[in-house]
Amino acid sequence: MSKNLEKIGTNAKIAFQNKISNKKKNKVLNYYIQLIKKNQNKILVENTKDIKIAKSKKLKENLIKRLALNNDKISSIIKSIKTISKFKDPVDVDIETWKRPNGLKLKKVSIPIGIIGVIYESRPNVTSDVSTLCFKSGNCVISVSYTHLRAHETMV
């Protein structure tokens, strides 16, 4: 397990160091939308498997309800990705500039954090929102949800 985490972390660091333009980010997000649309039926099939597993493990009904996907929820996920893709690029934005009495110019600039770790309950929209927001802001994400409910999240 630790070797796997080490590899994930190394890959995330490499990905973080490869800066891409906002235009390319939006192109990738549009491709992400196309992949979700193309694989919508497969995602729903995998989600059904996850629901069966959740029920067999006697998870609470409210968790199962949040886990469940349908065409409307997938449309909502796609809409969220489109909305995020329209955000201005937050990377390298000058937030504040000032000059010290000695003439030194200082600038506060927004930059990516790097690698963000997220642990959450299995919710398909969270998987998509977190990955999309991190990607748009130039960050990498390592996310962990309920391990026995991952088939559809891998697809998303």
What are the language-model segments listed below?
Residues 148-156:
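Single conserved hydrophobic/aromatic residue that forms the stacking wall/gate
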